Curated annotation (Swiss-Prot):
Entry's Gene Ontology cellular component terms: endoplasmic reticulum membrane
Species this chain originates from: Xenopus tropicalis
Membrane found in the keyword field: yes
Locus of motif KxHxx: 212-218
Membrane-spanning segments: 22-44, 64-81, 97-119, 123-141, 147-168, 183-200
The name this protein goes by in its record: Insulin-induced gene 2 protein
Subunit field text: Interacts with scap; interaction is direct and only takes place in the presence of sterols; it prevents interaction between scap and the coat protein complex II (COPII). Associates with the SCAP-SREBP complex; association is mediated via its interaction with scap and only takes place in the presence of sterols.
Site (Required for the recognition of 25-hydroxycholesterol): 108
């Protein structure tokens, strides 16, 4: 009798987890789209937008897919970081609170703002400054080997993909100085990967703690 009563409990425990995973992915997607739009507005000051400004007023813009791609990438990164932590057996415990995550987002936006607002002597100085700021963001809010490795991998992959799109005429920047864009793009991708990874980790931890609390109540 006891075994019959306990048998059906497997699927219900799986379904909430799957639903929570989908909700977490959706939230990360929306955050990614929002940050893409905000960061684009910052770059408008230099006329170096990641997609034409009219995307804000029309879904039929020639680059309407760019913020959607950013949202999809943000969801994938945010879900991947906790999975890698579990796979490596290295749960991330450094500064695991929402206030730290919000500061990380603020620093990420600040790095983007610096690339748009501050005038550097040359592109090399811009690259070195943003690289130092991005590594500083990782050291301040992450400090994990998995975070550093994924950040570098994301930066390399995203930069290569963006350049291939430009070279093949699928996409183009609005700036005449293409070298300027390439100077800050890898650093922005790296910092963005670290930021979305921290958000994903925090959401996963919040979900895990909620499930543990619920199991204790039951």
């Amino acid at each position: 009798m006891g075994e019959t009563d306990n048998a059906p409990r497997g699927p219900p425990s799986f379904l909430p987890h799957k639903m929570n995973l989908l909700l977490r992915g959706l939230l990360l997607f929306l955050i990614g789209v929002f940050l893409a739009l905000v960061l684009n507005l910052l770059q408008v000051q230099r006329n170096v937008t990641l997609f034409p400004p009219d995307v804000l007023s029309s879904l039929f813009s020639s680059a309407w897919w760019v913020p959607l791609c950013c949202g999809t990438a943000a969801a994938a990164i945010g879900l991947l970081y906790p999975c890698i932590d579990r796979h490596l057996g290295e749960p991330h415990k450094f500064k695991r609170e929402w206030s730290s995550v919000m500061r990380c987002v603020a620093v990420f936006v600040g790095i983007n703002h610096a690339s748009a607002k501050v005038d550097f002597a040359n592109n090399t100085q811009l690259s070195l400054t943003l690289a130092a700021l991005s590594i500083g963001l990782w050291w301040t809010f992450d400090r994990s080997r998995s975070g550093l490795g994924l950040g570098i991998g994301i930066s390399f992959f995203a930069t290569v993909v963006s350049q291939l799109l430009v070279y093949n005429g699928v996409y183009e920047y609005t700036a005449p100085d293409f070298l300027y864009v390439r100077s800050w793009l890898p650093c922005i991708f790296f910092a963005g990967g670290i930021t979305m990874g921290n958000i994903g980790r925090q959401l996963e931890m919040y979900e895990r703690l909620a499930l543990v609390e619920k199991s204790h109540r039951d």
